[in-house]
UniProtKB/Swiss-Prot annotation:
It is an enzyme of class 3 (hydrolase). PROSITE patterns: PYRASE_CYS, PYRASE_GLU. It comes from Streptococcus suis (strain 05ZYH33). This is Pyrrolidone-carboxylate peptidase. It catalyses: Release of an N-terminal pyroglutamyl group from a polypeptide, the second amino acid generally not being Pro. It is found in: Cytoplasm. The gene is pcp.
C-alpha cells in the first residue's frame, strides 16, 4: 500500500508550519504502508498542481493532506470539503480569491473517503485529543482537500483521500496568550496512528460512533 502524505509550507507570517515539520518527522513506512512525503505550497491552484503530479507519479492507495489550524486544541480529521475559495488572507503568492468556485465541473462538496472515525479512535487510544471536524475552512486547506477528492473522482478512482488539521506548535503560541498548542512529538504520534487506521480500514467500512456536533 502507498500513501501520499502532504504538508504545507509556512504561511500567514508564521516562520514554521507544523504540518511540514510533521511530515519531515514521519518514517518512510507505517503499518506496512509506503509513505510518500510531499511538501505543498500554500498557494491556490499551485497546491493542487503539485498534488496531481505526485498522484500521477505514484498512483497512491490513499492521500492524507495535513494542515495547520491555529487555535484548535486537538487533531481533527475533516469530514467534508466545499467547492468554494473564500480567502480571509492572501496565499503565499498574494492571491486572495473571494467566493470563487474551485472546480466548475466538480461536486458542490466532497466527503472524505478516509476512515475519519477510526482515525479519531486510534488517536484517542494513545491518549491524545482528537475529534471529527465539519469544516476545513475556505483557505488553501479546504482547497487542497477538495482538489484531492476531485482528482480521486475524476482521475484516480482507486485512491481514497482526506485531510487532517493539527494545532499550533508550542513555539508558535509564545506570543499568542490563550491559544492551544501540541508538541511536535505528540502530533507525529497522532498522525502515525491515524495513518495506521487508514491502512487497517483500507477495505473496511469506517466505524459507526457518534462524533458529530450540536452547533
Amino acid at each position: 500500500m502507498k500513501i501520499i502524505v502532504t504538508g504545507f509550507d509556512p504561511f500567514g507570517g508564521e516562520p514554521i508550519n507544523p504540518a511540514l515539520e510533521t511530515i519531515k518527522s514521519l518514517p518512510k513506512t507505517i503499518a506496512g504502508a509506503e509513505i510518500i512525503l510531499v511538501e505543498i505550497p500554500t498557494v491556490f491552484d499551485k497546491a493542487a498542481d503539485v498534488l496531481e503530479e505526485k498522484m500521477a507519479e505514484h498512483l497512491p492507495d490513499a492521500v492524507l493532506c495535513i494542515g495547520q489550524a491555529g487555535g484548535r486544541v486537538d487533531l481533527t480529521p475533516e469530514r467534508i470539503a466545499i467547492n468554494q475559495d473564500d480567502a480571509r488572507i492572501p496565499d503565499n503568492e498574494g492571491q486572495q480569491p473571494i467566493d470563487r468556485t474551485i472546480r466548475e465541473d466538480g461536486q458542490p462538496a466532497y466527503f472524505s473517503t478516509l476512515p475519519i472515525k477510526a482515525m479519531v479512535e486510534a488517536i484517542h487510544r494513545i491518549g491524545l485529543p482528537a475529534s471529527v471536524s465539519n469544516t476545513a475552512g475556505t483557505f488553501v486547506c479546504n482547497h487542497l482537500m477538495y482538489q484531492a477528492l476531485y482528482l480521486a473522482e475524476k482521475q484516480f478512482p482507486k485512491t481514497k483521500a482526506g485531510f487532517l488539521h493539527i494545532p499550533f506548535l508550542p513555539e508558535q503560541v509564545v506570543d499568542k496568550p490563550g491559544l492551544a498548542s501540541m508538541s511536535l512529538n505528540d502530533i507525529v504520534r497522532g498522525v502515525e496512528v491515524a495513518i495506521g487506521a487508514i491502512v487497517e480500514y483500507r477495505d473496511k467500512e469506517d466505524i459507526k460512533k457518534g462524533g458529530g456536533s450540536t452547533h
